[in-house]
């Protein structure tokens, strides 16, 4: 009986610690968002002295927003940059989109590469290899096809690339679009994701997504170049790790990495979250414990039980109050990341928030159940440590 009492006491203490850690993350991410994101920073170097940048753009297929997204890169206000458009297949409709933009902007230093180069199992790396091999500038900007930018986005990122910084990344967010699926994505990327992403980076944990990353080519080459990361599906994590291992710091851009895909749905969002969870579990096994207890409903139950055990407070009353406080702070976080008025009502936010939170256990269990993922044109079996093998159809 004494052992059981001790175990329950330990669990209650854990619940209290969890409460303080999670609310520290809430406050930290909100304060950082208010102080750093969507702020016009003073130029750290003269415009004409900004370093040259080689933009690597991996392309696969076409959606309704692709040409508009790509065009924003051709309209960048930056002194020296090149655009290296990389398409895997000759018959990909993205080829025609690229040729149209190359014809429309002849003064922009841009080239189209078709065919890729097979160096590993990662299709994105294979696609980018021809562009990477001819990149002429010291800074490499890898930016996904669904991202759109402002004319001064690259200037903002380059100004963050100070002497001791080896990687500048943008906080992923989602552009205003129509439909509930768009609202669901915006709520996730404006609440749960930035809370973890910002808290990790501010406290020194290297957390980077590869949607928009500006890196020093010299450092990547020291790590073996892009080919060194072709064995991984989550190449962005291992690129960031390689840069950090060499003593370089990271910096977050003041502008978000604005996702603007023209193809989106609730099922696509759910599949994407499951794929990401699978990658995290295989790269960082501690995720199996940390991830579920960092979500609102599970955390509220654990903390509510701890409050009942220690203070004899009603579990359900505490659970409801804790969820309500979480809901309100998430809304504050969302408004900060948005940097302006939201494109949907508070009722839409409430529904999307509840559905997103309700999905979390299903997403996590689905990720545990099946270690294979489908990405781009292939299926892959994940291994512990982050490597993967391609599953070939027999």
Curated annotation (Swiss-Prot):
Residues 1-10, 216-287, 329-348 are lumenal. A motif (D3) lies at residue 236. It is an enzyme of class 2 (transferase). A motif (D2) lies at residue 144. Pathway: Lipid metabolism; sphingolipid metabolism. GO terms for molecular function: ceramide glucosyltransferase activity. InterPro entries: Ceramide_glucosylTrfase (IPR025993), Nucleotide-diphossugar_trans (IPR029044). The keyword Lipid metabolism applies. It is found in: Golgi apparatus membrane. A motif ((Q/R)XXRW) lies at residues 272-276. Participates in the initial step of the glucosylceramide-based glycosphingolipid/GSL synthetic pathway at the cytosolic surface of the Golgi. Catalyzes the transfer of glucose from UDP-glucose to ceramide to produce glucosylceramide/GlcCer (such as beta-D-glucosyl-(1<->1')-N-acylsphing-4-enine). Glucosylceramide is the core component of glycosphingolipids/GSLs, amphipathic molecules consisting of a ceramide lipid moiety embedded in the outer leaflet of the membrane, linked to one of hundreds of different externally oriented oligosaccharide structures. Belongs to the glycosyltransferase 2 family. This is Ceramide glucosyltransferase-B.
